[in-house]
């Protein structure tokens, strides 16, 4: 296969990929038709001069591989690095990587209702978030989804937010101890709770965990990580806390104002974090 | 000189006050002793250090009689050591009482700062100044925490209440009566508590459901630990390939169709051999298609057999017990009845749930599949 980019000036360059794309559209297997909508849009963008003589089928297959890779990588909820995507899936298709990613993101959205989001601008690591607002009845449909750790995560997130966006690790354990979760004791559900909170949640980027300087004995502080801001928001966490209290979110004026400001700032840069735009 | 000394002792007295003002009386003595010990150790180190300093100074061609300047330096040293000790003591005390300083509205922190201020008057060398800086960092850190404390006081957020409300929220208001500690509770209570909380929490998050294969993915066996340096690269490669799933050689719709045809033919062959062997006894449909070891194989078999029926190589009938049986359509035996069967096409839907399958396997006591895997 010819990988080298062809000369821009040559007239054949324009025709070649065009023919490849068009021709394969008719011969392609039925699966490629399902994504007809997205491939239509991509034809123009993918016929960039760098595209070698790849058939549409090959590109469709690559996109499908990428979708599967992203879904499987998401199992562990650890952000997916661009280098891993390039290494394991994209390979020789590096030149069309941005378009592959864009198409994969489109398909994830059409089929699963998931949004592929860059964790932080220019971080080159991605996560999937659910675009569909959760419905109460979904909980029953969901079935057994492994260990129920979201409750613990939500509690920690709530504590952090209510305590002014930072909390010491000691405070977290003082709280969780009352719920039967000890840092050093094996827990029925969470196994090693200290590892779950200070390692797993941190690697998944739900939490930031850092040493507080000049403390003796050494203590650490916990804050929200970037994933938290994408999957939930200050307002949602406040509403969760308020619901537990059976009170109105406005009963905590400081937090409420902060959450409100956060909502407003979210509304303004609408597509700032979309992966496609960063390419 | 005397004035300085006075201020120093004043500082010491103040420290005593400081210590008293904090509520850890029963520990004071012990800690004081420890502190003194620690300091003595440090002093010892200082002494050594300074001793070596002076010894390195010794070879200097100084006159044997003590120079007045040199004498003052010695006095200074004594004073500096005292200042350092006091700084360390101060830092230690504040460190120990961190919690109290942060949580109570006392003036302890400002008193400590004042004390440090007094100490700083006597500081003339970098070494002592560094200790002062260290104390200042600690004090400002505490100040920050105190400020935060003030903030949360205003917010009326009470973690302890939150904790109790969490239990209430899930409907566990009786927990406190039944078991003193949540950790003493029954496993099922713990499970349902976190389960319910998990459900509630997921409705506040946009977490993507994780994708899993119905029958799981291939087990990624841990690759054997990398052979020691001496080993060949080829050996590594062999080991690595153990992790890979078998690659799909060809994925083609046509190829798929071919396999269906082949399977149908194979199964027809099986059926016909049976008919030849026992020409008078029709085969029970269930016994023929059910694979007791695999539900999916069973479904496949039903699918293949349906082709055989459609093409008229066999037919399904209900026997006297109203159980489906398969019997051959004998070409020679073409009478009116069978004619009407073969030409009047009938459609039927077979439903088979996993539970049905299990029931059939146990009822018919099927221990072996009649249609064996071809691969």
UniProtKB/Swiss-Prot annotation, chain A:
| Record's keyword annotation contains DNA repair | yes
Q: Which GO terms describe its molecular function?
A: protein dimerization activity
Q: Where is the MAGE domain?
A: 59-259
What InterPro entries does the annotation carry? MAGE, MAGE_WH1, MAGE_WH2, MHD_dom
Q: Which GO terms describe its biological process?
A: cellular response to hydroxyurea; cellular response to radiation; cellular response to UV; DNA recombination; DNA repair; positive regulation of protein ubiquitination; regulation of DNA-templated transcription
* Assigned keywords, A-Z: Chromosome, Cytoplasm, DNA damage, DNA recombination, DNA repair, Growth regulation, Nucleus, Phosphoprotein, Telomere, Tumor antigen, Ubl conjugation pathway
The tissues where this chain's protein is expressed are given as: Ubiquitous.
Please give the residue positions where the record annotates the modification Phosphoserine: 38
Tell me where on the tree of life, at the top rank, the source sits.
Eukaryota
For bias type Low complexity, the affected ranges are 30-48
Residue intervals passing through the bilayer: none
Provide an example Pfam family for this protein: MAGE
Quaternary structure, from the entry: Component of the SMC5-SMC6 complex which consists at least of SMC5, SMC6, NSMCE2, NSMCE1, NSMCE4A or EID3 and NSMCE3. NSMCE1, NSMCE4A or EID3 and NSMCE3 probably form a subcomplex that bridges the head domains of the SMC5:SMC6 heterodimer. Interacts with PJA1. Interacts with E2F1 (via C-terminus). Interacts with NGFR (via C-terminus). Interacts with NSMCE1. Interacts with NSMCE4. Interacts with SMC6. Interacts with EID3.
Identification of the protein by name: Non-structural maintenance of chromosomes element 3 homolog
Q: Which organism is it from?
A: Mus musculus
Q: What is the lineage of its organism?
A: Eukaryota, Metazoa, Chordata, Craniata, Vertebrata
Q: Which gene encodes it?
A: Nsmce3
Swiss-Prot record, chain B:
Q: Which residues fall in a compositionally biased region of kind Acidic residues?
A: 42-60
Cite the entry's keywords alphabetically: Chromosome, Coiled coil, Cytoplasm, DNA damage, DNA recombination, DNA repair, Nucleus, Repressor, Telomere, Transcription, Transcription regulation
Q: Name one Pfam family in it.
A: Nse4-Nse3_bdg
Q: Name one GO biological process term.
A: DNA repair
Is Ligase set as a keyword in this record? Answer: no
Q: Which GO terms describe its cellular component?
A: chromosome, telomeric region; cytoplasm; nucleolus; nucleoplasm; Smc5-Smc6 complex
Where, if anywhere, are coiled coils annotated?
23-51
Instruction: State the residue spans of region: Disordered.
Output: 30-68
Localization, UniProt: Nucleus; Cytoplasm; Chromosome, Telomere
Q: What family is this?
A: Belongs to the NSE4 family.
Q: What is the purpose of this protein? A: Tissue-specific component of the SMC5-SMC6 complex, a complex involved in repair of DNA double-strand breaks by homologous recombination. The complex may promote sister chromatid homologous recombination by recruiting the SMC1-SMC3 cohesin complex to double-strand breaks. The complex is required for telomere maintenance via recombination and mediates sumoylation of shelterin complex (telosome) components.
Oligomeric and partner information:
Component of the SMC5-SMC6 complex which consists at least of SMC5, SMC6, NSMCE2, NSMCE1, NSMCE4A or EID3 and NSMCE3; EID3 seems to be a testis-specific subunit. NSMCE1, NSMCE4A or EID3 and NSMCE3 probably form a subcomplex that bridges the head domains of the SMC5:SMC6 heterodimer. Homodimer, and heterodimer with EID2. Interacts with the C-terminal region of CREBBP.
User: Per its record, how is this protein called by name?
Assistant: EP300-interacting inhibitor of differentiation 3
Q: Which organism is it from?
A: Mus musculus (Mouse)
Q: What gene name is listed for this protein?
A: Eid3
């Amino acid at each position: 296969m010819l990988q080298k980019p062809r000369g821009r000036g040559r007239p054949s360059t324009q025709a070649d990929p065009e023919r490849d794309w068009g021709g394969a559209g008719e011969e392609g297997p039925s699966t490629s038709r399902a994504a007809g909508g997205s491939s239509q849009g991509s034809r123009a963008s993918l016929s960039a001069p760098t595209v070698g003589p790849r058939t549409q089928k090959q590109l469709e297959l690559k996109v499908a591989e990428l979708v599967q890779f992203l879904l499987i990588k998401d199992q562990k909820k650890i952000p997916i690095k661009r280098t891993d995507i390039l290494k394991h899936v994209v390979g020789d298709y590096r030149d069309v990587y941005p378009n592959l990613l864009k198409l994969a993101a489109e398909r994830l959205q059409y089929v699963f209702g998931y949004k592929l989001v860059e964790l932080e601008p220019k971080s080159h690591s991605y996560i999937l978030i659910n675009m569909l607002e959760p419905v109460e009845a979904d909980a029953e449909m969901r079935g057994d989804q492994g260990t129920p750790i979201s409750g613990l995560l939500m509690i920690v997130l709530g504590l952090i937010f209510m305590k002014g966006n930072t909390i010491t690790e000691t405070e977290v354990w003082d709280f969780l101890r009352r719920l039967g979760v000890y840092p050093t004791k094996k827990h029925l559900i969470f196994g090693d709770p200290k590892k779950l909170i200070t390692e797993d949640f941190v690697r998944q980027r739900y939490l930031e965990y850092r040493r507080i300087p000049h403390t003796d004995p050494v203590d650490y502080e916990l804050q929200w990580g970037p994933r938290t801001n994408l999957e939930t928001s200050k307002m949602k966490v406040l509403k969760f806390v308020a619901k537990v209290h059976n009170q109105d979110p406005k009963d905590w004026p400081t937090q409420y104002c902060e959450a409100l400001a956060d909502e407003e700032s979210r509304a303004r840069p609408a597509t700032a974090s979309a992966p496609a735009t960063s390419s | 000189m005397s004035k300085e000394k006075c201020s120093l002792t004043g500082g010491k007295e103040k420290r005593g006050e400081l210590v008293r003002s904090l509520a850890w009386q029963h520990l004071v003595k012990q800690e004081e002793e420890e502190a003194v010990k620690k300091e003595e150790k440090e002093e010892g180190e200082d002494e050594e250090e300074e001793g070596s300093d002076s010894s390195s100074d010794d070879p200097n061609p100084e006159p044997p009689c003590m120079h007045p300047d040199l004498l003052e330096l010695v006095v200074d040293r004594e004073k500096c050591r005292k200042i350092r000790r006091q700084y360390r003591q101060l830092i230690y005390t504040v460190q120990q009482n961190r919690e109290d300083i942060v949580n109570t509205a006392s003036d302890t922190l400002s008193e400590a700062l004042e004390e440090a201020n007094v100490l700083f008057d006597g500081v003339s060398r970098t070494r002592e100044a560094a200790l002062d800086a260290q104390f200042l960092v600690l004090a400002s850190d505490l100040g920050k925490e105190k400020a935060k404390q003030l903030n949360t006081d205003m917010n009326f957020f009470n973690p302890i209440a939150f904790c109790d409300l969490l239990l209430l929220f899930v409907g566990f208001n009786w927990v406190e009566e039944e078991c003193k500690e949540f950790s003493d509770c029954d496993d099922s209570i713990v499970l349902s508590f976190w389960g319910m909380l998990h459900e509630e929490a997921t409705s506040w998050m946009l977490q993507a459901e994780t994708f899993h294969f119905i029958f799981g993915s291939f087990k990624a066996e841990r690759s054997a630990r990398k052979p020691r340096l001496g080993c060949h690269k080829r050996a590594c490669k062999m080991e690595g390939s153990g992790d890979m799933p078998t690659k799909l050689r060809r994925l083609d719709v046509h190829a798929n169709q071919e396999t269906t045809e082949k399977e149908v033919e194979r199964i027809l062959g099986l059926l016909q051999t049976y008919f030849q062997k026992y020409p008078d006894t029709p085969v029970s449909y269930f016994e023929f298609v059910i694979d007791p070891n695999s539900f999916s194989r069973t479904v496949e078999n039903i699918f293949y057999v349906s082709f055989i029926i459609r093409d008229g190589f066999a037919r399904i009938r209900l026997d006297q017990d109203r159980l489906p049986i398969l019997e051959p359509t004998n070409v020679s035996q073409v009478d009116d009845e069978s004619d009407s069967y073969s030409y009047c096409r009938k459609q039927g839907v077979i439903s088979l749930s996993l539970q049905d399958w299990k029931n059939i396997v146990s009822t018919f006591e099927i221990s072996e599949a009649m249609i064996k895997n071809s691969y």
